């Protein structure tokens, strides 16, 4: 007696009813997947390598090979452009649908200005009181803090240096003028006090070739040549 054919239960795992069975290792690109890739087109240059592109874009060499179906490092020069896979965050997948909810949550978390103002004023009063106790002076809100003097630009520094050099030159010239006007007469009286110095001043410097030592040496040489 033939047994009655069994009918598949509703919603079962049959071919027509229920979800479709998939084999091991099959890839499914689900719309709910938190990880998605966005591809950038990179124009290849003579010095480009897979390792350099991976470091530049923050991806692995295997991901670049998989996106462009490459097998070796030398095969990148067979193409003009390469696609670089870049991972996108899950927030970018919603296309701004949850942006309104996030904004509403931020508005609820943010305190109002009326609540923040008294706390800030109390904190400022405490800081000013502590500063006065320590002897420090805090500027008022309407009063601007003086700019530091030592912050000079390069041109200002060079101008200041030039002015200092000119002042030092003027001071040196004045000293030289004062020395020429008063000192020479006194020096002359001191140097010409001895008779020997007076003779030197009249006759001038005595050359070394006319000393007695040189005369005796010349006389000895003449006697040797005569012999």
From Swiss-Prot:
Keywords: Phosphoprotein. It comes from the Eukaryota. The modification Phosphoserine is found at residues 23, 33, 99, 166, 181, 194, 212. InterPro entries: LYSM1-4 (IPR045030), LysM_dom (IPR018392), LysM_dom_sf (IPR036779). The keyword Hydrolase does not apply. Residues 98-107 have a biased composition (Acidic residues). Pfam families: LysM (PF01476). Residues 40-84 form the LysM domain. PANTHER family: AND PUTATIVE PEPTIDOGLYCAN-BINDING DOMAIN-CONTAINING PROTEIN 1-RELATED (PTHR20932:SF2), LYSM AND PUTATIVE PEPTIDOGLYCAN-BINDING DOMAIN-CONTAINING PROTEIN (PTHR20932). This is LysM and putative peptidoglycan-binding domain-containing protein 1.
């Amino acid at each position: 007696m033939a047994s009655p054919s069994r009918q598949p239960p509703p919603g079962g795992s049959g071919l027509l009813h229920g979800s479709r069975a998939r084999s091991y290792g099959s890839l499914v690109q689900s719309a709910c997947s938190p990880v998605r890739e966005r591809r950038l087109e990179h124009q290849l240059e003579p010095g480009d390598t897979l390792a350099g592109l991976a470091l530049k874009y923050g991806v692995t060499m295997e991901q670049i090979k998989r996106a462009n179906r490459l097998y070796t490092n030398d095969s990148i020069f067979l193409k003009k452009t390469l696609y670089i896979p870049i991972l996108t965050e899950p927030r970018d997948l919603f296309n701004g649908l949850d942006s309104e909810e996030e904004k509403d949550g931020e508005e609820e978390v943010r305190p109002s200005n009326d609540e923040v103002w008294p706390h800030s004023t109390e904190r400022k009063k405490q800081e000013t009181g502590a500063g006065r106790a320590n002897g420090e002076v805090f500027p008022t809100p309407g009063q601007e803090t003086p700019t530091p003097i030592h912050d000079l630009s390069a041109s200002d520094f060079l101008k200041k240096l030039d002015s200092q050099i000119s002042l030092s030159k003027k001071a040196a010239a004045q000293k030289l003028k004062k020395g020429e006007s008063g000192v020479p007469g006194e020096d002359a009286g001191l140097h010409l006090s001895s008779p020997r110095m007076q003779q030197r001043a009249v006759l001038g410097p005595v050359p070394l070739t006319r000393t007695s030592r040189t005369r005796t040496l010349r006389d000895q040489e003449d006697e040797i040549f005569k012999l």
